[in-house]
Design a protein with these regions (language model features):
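Interaction-mediating elements
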Residues: 22-146
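Bacterial Sec-dependent N-terminal signal peptides
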Residues: 1-24, 40
Length: 146
């Protein structure tokens, strides 16, 4: 009886994990939140969208847009940007908070930002020299990782 209960619990756990594992759905750019569409028009006007998708998690929805240049932008449910990753180019200057841009130009003048992420705790910035800088929400540098 005990083995049967364990087996039933394992089957249930496996079933629920596979149900929520892959909830990605391709979408058109027009299905993105208006704020995200405006962000793309403003900061990536010459980029062509390769594809866009909506990712549903248990309690959250995010959007991802990948351009033909391999640059990528992730958006939150409300259309705010979460991550900008410009693999083969630099992140548009208007996206980078002024305090972070000033720090990078002062201490790393020969580099540029290729990726920036933000969440509820911090900003993470990746430079062309491979360094990753982490800032708190008040733009104080809190970590440097190579």
């Amino acid at each position: 009886m005990k083995k049967l209960l364990i087996l039933a619990a394992a089957v249930f756990a496996l079933g629920t994990s596979t149900v929520s594992a892959d909830n990605d759905r391709p979408i058109s750019v027009s299905e993105l939140p208006e704020k995200a569409q405006q962000f793309i028009r403003q900061h990536f006007p010459n980029e062509k969208v390769s594809f866009a998708k909506m990712e549903r998690e248990l309690f959250d929805t995010t959007y991802e847009v990948i351009f033909t240049s391999s640059s990528k932008v992730e958006f939150l449910k409300n259309g705010d940007w979460k991550e900008v990753d410009c693999k083969y180019s630099t992140v548009p200057a208007a996206i980078i908070p002024q305090q972070i841009a000033q720090y990078v130009s002062q201490y790393y003048p020969d580099t540029s930002v290729v990726q920036i992420d933000r969440d509820k705790r911090d900003y993470e910035v990746k430079l062309t020299n491979g360094l990753e800088l982490t800032y708190d929400l008040k733009f104080n540098l809190i970590d440097i990782d190579d």
